[in-house]
Amino acid sequence: MVTRRILLGIATLAAFLPPASAPAQPIQVVMWDEQQPSQKQAYSNFLGNEIAGYLASRPGLAVRAVTLDDAGQGLGSDVLDNCQVLIYWDHARHHEVKRDKAREIVRRIKSGQIAMISLHSAHWSLPFIEAMAEVTRTRTTQRYASADQQVEINFVQGQDFVGPKRDSQITPRVAARKFPDGRTALKVYLPNCAFPGWREDGKPSYLTTLLPNHPIARDIPARFTLPATEMYDEPFHIPRPDEVVFEERWTGGEWFRSGCVWQLGRGRVFYFRPGHETFPVYKEKIPLKIIENAVRWLAAPR
């Protein structure tokens, strides 16, 4: 029989114990997918839903899948207000996304409200283009803010969705003109966010983990192979990444910076290259694990 004295002792002990901590809130993840019909060749329920389903099965993640055809293009305030990490896939309908939607995403990244993961062909998504343009503007402004001489900066946006040729000058780039009165005029050509070579042949690619201690590379092999991918070839017209986590190569000699991170204000952007929507890349364990790692790292308090 439990005596009154024992019960009082338990109550007294409990009074000195720290209160139980509230359970950690799950990371709010939004998977945005254009859902082009050709995805059905590899994903019976679309690529975005494949990724969302995997992430939803992992502890500590709350996942919402949205599409371009949803209300507000799947990017309304009701979605973004409840998002910590936005994963973005598009390919054939880049131009249908409203630019003000892309700029709102960038504003939220800069403020630290959200982070973004752009996958494969989303190198030409408007949110990624706008994010890379803003990285370029920020770096350029910071570099010349303390210059003794007067510097005038003109940012030049190229034509959307027109890829560079092999001999095109790499963007972003700066053309400077100095005047006798001490002024310097800079013309800054914003990044094209594309590359001169690609091949949709479904051949293997060979990836190397360049930063094995990076949180995105946690539990990822030093080297691994994807059995069927689309090839992208450098040079990738992007601002210099703050970190390159993975490099990808093909037997034809092509190579690509396939896992790039940029700091943008108080937020971050991660670009992960492997794809094509007709190849089951995102049924492979390693790419899914990389996305999960990226979600957890991008959402971590800084």
What is each of the regions a protein language model found here?
Residues 4-8:
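N-terminal export leaders
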Residues 12-14:
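Alpha-helical assembly-interface signal, strongest on the long, hydrophobic N-terminal helix that forms
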Residues 16-21:
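C-terminal segment of classical bacterial N-terminal signal peptides
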Residues 25-27, 67, 109, 238-243, ...:
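Extracellular ligand-binding/catalytic regions of CAZymes and related secreted enzymes
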Residues 31, 36, 40-134:
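Helical hinge/lid and interdomain linker segments adjacent to catalytic or ligand-binding clefts
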Residues 52, 106, 217, 292-295:
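Non-transmembrane alpha-helical segments in soluble domains
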Residues 56, 62-64, 82, 158-265:
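Catalytic beta-strand/loop cores that center a nucleophilic Ser/Cys/Thr
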Residues 93-213:
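A glycine-rich, often tryptophan-bearing local segment used as a flexible ligand/cofactor-contacting loop or short
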